[in-house]
Amino acid sequence: MNILILDTSSNEKITVGLVINGKKDIRVEKIISNKTQIILPLIDKLLKKHSLKPYDLSEIQINPGPGSFTGLRIGLAIANAMSFALKIPINEENGKIILPIYS
C-alpha cells in the first residue's frame, strides 16, 4: 500500500510524504514562493526517489485543517484532481474518507 501524504495547512511550510508498506518518508519544504509552484515538483521528486509512478499510489491522505484557507484549498484541489485521475480515495489523517471515491 502506497499512500501520499499532503499537508498544506501552514503558511510557512508544505509537508509531502509517502507511506510505503508502513514506512514513512516525509519532506517538509519552507515556503519561499507560491505553494502551487512547490507542491507538484515536491510530489514528483518524492515519487521518483522511490521509483514510483502516480498510478502506484493507493490512497491520498490529507490534513483537512484547521489552517490557512488558501493553503487548504490548494492541497485539496491537488488531492481531488489526483484522486479523480487515479481513481483512489482521499482520507484525512485518521483514515476517515473526506471526499468520494471516483469510479
Where are the model-predicted features located?
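DPxDG-like acidic metal-binding loop motif
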Residues: 59, 63-64, 70-88
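A generic secondary-structure micro-motif detector
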Residues: 33, 68-69
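Oxyanion-binding and handling regions
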Residues: 1-44, 48-55, 85-103
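Short glycine-rich anion-binding loops that position phosphate/pyrophosphate groups of nucleotides
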Residues: 11, 65-66
